[in-house]
UniProtKB/Swiss-Prot annotation:
Heterodimer of PMPCA (alpha) and PMPCB (beta) subunits, forming the mitochondrial processing protease (MPP) in which PMPCA is involved in substrate recognition and binding and PMPCB is the catalytic subunit. The gene is Pmpca. The modification N6-acetyllysine is found at residue 298. GO terms for cellular component: mitochondrial inner membrane; mitochondrial matrix; mitochondrion. It is found in: Mitochondrion matrix; Mitochondrion inner membrane. GO terms for biological process: protein processing involved in protein targeting to mitochondrion. It comes from the Eukaryota. This is Mitochondrial-processing peptidase subunit alpha. Keywords: Acetylation, Membrane, Mitochondrion, Mitochondrion inner membrane, Transit peptide. InterPro entries: Metalloenz_LuxS/M16, MPP/UQCRC_Complex, Pept_M16_N, Pept_M16_Zn_BS, Peptidase_M16_C.
Amino acid sequence: MATAVWAAARLLRGSAVLCARPRFGSPAHRRFSSGATYPNIPLSSPLPGVPKPIFATVDGQEKFETKVTTLDNGLRVASQNKFGQFCTVGILINSGSRYEAKYLSGIAHFLEKLAFSSTARFDSKDEILLTLEKHGGICDCQTSRDTTMYAVSADSKGLDTVVDLLADVVLHPRLTDEEIEMTRMAVQFELEDLNMRPDPEPLLTEMIHEAAFRENTVGLHRFCPVENIAKIDREVLHSYLKNYYTPDRMVLAGVGVEHEHLVECARKYLVGAEPAWGAPGTVDVDRSVAQYTGGIIKVERDMSNVSLGPTPIPELTHIMVGLESCSFLEDDFIPFAVLNMMMGGGGSFSAGGPGKGMFSRLYLNVLNRHHWMYNATSYHHSYEDTGLLCIHASADPRQVREMVEIITKEFILMGRTVDLVELERAKTQLMSMLMMNLESRPVIFEDVGRQVLATHSRKLPHELCTLIRNVKPEDIKRVASKMLRGKPAVAALGDLTDLPTYEHIQAALSSRNGHLPRSYRLFR
């Protein structure tokens, strides 16, 4: 027992000696309070004897240019170098729901769900994911009204594997009966989810496009209609793919890669490859130009029980009012983007903060003044041949008429005097949002791909910022006044008992003050 106590005491003494020694060299000389080594030196002055720090300079210019090469088969290869060991590479295709006029609506929706399934070289989606996993990669496919995008983010060292895989996924999908049946179920579930979701924004966006461009181009269904789910099969998909998945309608875009290496991979895997639907022959591409019609789409629905949790959500009626703006190829696109930011808006219970837009018009004039308004948000959708600026508002069904009048007044005010302070705030917020978004590699990839797909080149961020800075109050007034001369598009969802007629909404937007015409009832 005595031996054990003696050994423990010796061990503790040894530990104390070890702890007393400095772990890394000699202890630093530090003094505090009045005995400081550098007395009376304010924090704003550099310490004597300390090397001056060298800070990075910011000139607002991109360090790497966007390079574009067009191959012999018409495929465009675009790249933007970026620091880091990871890259984002993908294929963007000029296809989407706007090109389905001669087909069943919903093909693009099906292709989005079928992406990265079995191909000529890969037996299943799991095999594709395992291949990407070796390079730390993930994949995704998104379709919109005018673009389909297949993208992979992975280690830059695996660029060859990634481009090879993308080529196989895009050009050689198997589209087995089992996969198509699973896709039918996935589409059905997504449609059910859209109708049950408390946030109606995706559904309203679909409705406002249908109202604005009735049965043409961007007004065609973005989501597959229920009646078409069972009708879409491999033959229909191959017919669509043959016409729209051609090299001249594609861009291979990459961020964080060397341009020459990406071009080499494109030539190796995407030139001369025969797709699964056969050799390309005569194609039948829909080149229709969007025709804005205006109009109204109404969906009567009981919104009193959409809560998915224990906290009840109040019954609301949702209205979206829109007017035709311009395409992203026009010079007026930038003033419209600034106008949209100036309108801003959001939800009535959204937490504020710097850059949140709490001084935008829809907050100051609508949400702050009318406590019963639950939402007022401005959206701007722009395409290669048209655009749509709209305001989404939500309120209790009993106050629908008043809500619509408030929105029509805000549209009228767009064409009136623009305050310089609010304009500068909107321009600054738009530029900061642009630059912050472009700090993300996948966002840069999408920006490069979409711009090159539409214009064969890319405007760099500092060029866009210059255009934003040059927007004047008269530009906002001019584009707003031109927009207000068109017919409105209206989408309404919920209890629509007190919804004004389309003719009354159109009259309010044509008036000087935005007031709805009085409605008279013989019986109350």
